[in-house]
């Protein structure tokens, strides 16, 4: 059982790790927004919140941008995370997003993770330099 990022709120398409954003060389630095959904549905197919995730240290569950290939061109500060689209305006690039002290399983308990990418890299190509990390957690029966 594992919470995963999905590209849709119903949890039918697992996030592949690539955001479909394009930056054009004549217009770099323009923010592009998207939404991912963080949820667990494998052990809770009836969507009744049977399980909960808690941070191992007793604090909040954190989702953090990570640099998968340091020095490769993209920096974690290019990614802002928020739980709402309007929250992206005041979010700090590269900062962790707190998802609260616990999350419950099931599609109806999906957490929207709004993502804003602002990059000045203008080299054409697909970049897989950046990803997401989560702090250590435990899964418990609800």
Name each region found by the language model.
Residues 28-39, 109-112, 122-134:
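Short, solvent-exposed loop/turn segments enriched in Ser/Thr/Gly
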Residues 23-25, 52-63, 92-105:
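Low-complexity, Ser/Thr/Pro-rich intrinsically disordered linker/stalk segments at domain junctions
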Residues 86, 91-122:
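Intrinsically disordered, low-complexity Pro/Gly/Ser/Thr-rich segments with frequent PxxP/GP/PP motifs
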Residues 1-13, 126, 132-142:
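Short, polar/proline-rich extracytoplasmic segments that appear immediately after membrane translocation
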Residues 2-46, 55-58:
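Beta-sheet-dominated interaction scaffolds and their linkers
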Residues 40-42, 117-121, 134-140:
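Beta-strand elements of well-folded, non-transmembrane domains
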Residues 13-24, 68-70, 81, 124, ...:
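Primarily extracellular surface-attachment and macromolecule-engagement regions
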Residues 32-87:
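Surface-exposed interaction patch
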């Amino acid at each position: 059982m594992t919470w995963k990022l999905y590209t849709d709120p119903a949890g039918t398409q697992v996030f592949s790790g690539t955001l479909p954003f394009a930056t054009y060389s004549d217009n770099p630095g323009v923010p592009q927004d998207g939404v991912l959904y963080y949820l667990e549905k494998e052990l809770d197919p009836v969507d009744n919140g049977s399980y909960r995730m808690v941070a191992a240290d007793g604090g909040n569950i954190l989702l953090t941008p990570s640099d998968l290939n340091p020095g490769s061109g993209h920096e974690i500060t290019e990614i802002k995370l928020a739980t709402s689209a309007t929250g992206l305006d005041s979010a700090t690039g590269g900062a962790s997003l707190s998802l609260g002290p616990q999350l419950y399983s099931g599609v109806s308990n999906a957490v929207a993770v709004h993502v804003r990418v602002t990059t000045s890299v203008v080299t054409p190509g697909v970049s897989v330099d950046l990803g997401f990390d989560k702090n250590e957690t435990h899964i418990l029966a609800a």
